Amino acid sequence: MNINTASLINFTQSLVRIPSFSIQEKAVVERVIEEMHSLGFDRAWIDEYGSAVGVIEGARSGPTLLLDGHCDTVGAIPADWSHDPFGAEIVGDMMYGRGTADMKGNLAAMIYAAASVDRARLAGRVAVSATVNEELMEGPTLKAIMDVLHPDGVVIGEATRLNLNRGGRGRAEVVIETRGRSAHSSSPQAGLCAIHEMIKVIQAVEGLEVQVDPLLGPGFMVLTDIISDPYPGHSVIANRCRATYDRRLLVGETLQTVLEKIDSCAGLEGVDFSTSVLYGEEKTYTGADLKMSKFYPAWKFAEEHPFVQSALRGLRSAGLSGACARTLCKGCATPAAGPSSPRIKHLGAAAALGVLDKA
């Protein structure tokens, strides 16, 4: 496998220099397609949701391997950065910029790796997808590509320090709503403040036991926002209050078990509250609709799984440690491996050039 490292670095810089916040990925997707054509992919196209897909065909029939990386990023406030988030500046062996680690550097490495495959020796095909909207809604744009390609295995290029992740915690956006009784603030005894009721629920949730998976870690809940109604209050006691939690899921947890655990909290017998999972509705930059419950189950594969073992052998043959750890997809073998560290995916994101080349 011969990779032109200078071209890989230049391509990564070009991706980082194109802002591609969720729902604004059109320009970066077009840049990906341009590079796929330049590198000799047999087919490259943009699907209905706006994701880029490229395919390398082998000389003989065989399984399909899909390499996936999302091309959207979270936002960036330049004042919070020590380097221009869209400058792709190289200092020493590090490239700085939004998306270098999560996950434009990883995506670029996968595109170049696929392009370098010896077609004469390849039985099957290698595909690469640059999916959109992942930061807002995980999964549906990747699933759409899988429904077309029917891959036998998927590798997702998340930041793993080049280890192989064989499992991942799931995630749910849990909404809790409390109900009270409105009254003017001059007569508080006539009302029941939904905010005070929410405080009781929050305290009960904080007291819930956190389950721990030996591979995936803890299945915790984090409060991410809270708002009362009416807002602003204007001297009116709130009759409703809504809080959103980010709940990290472990294998075997379902929507029902997650909500029942909150509903059955001790000490909330007199509190009028309800729980639900947020239903997401988004439009991609092409105008296509994405709709789904924001409940993404956890998953993990045994270390002995044939695809996991095959991936480990590949890492080790490339001179990497091939350590097996945790991290996304349902229905087929889906390990993850990529350059950089999970800790630097967002604020001050950077990627080591040497690690990018190894990826």
Predicted regions and their residues:
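Short glycine/serine- and small hydrophobic-enriched flexible loop segments
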Residues: S14, Y112-R119, K200-E206
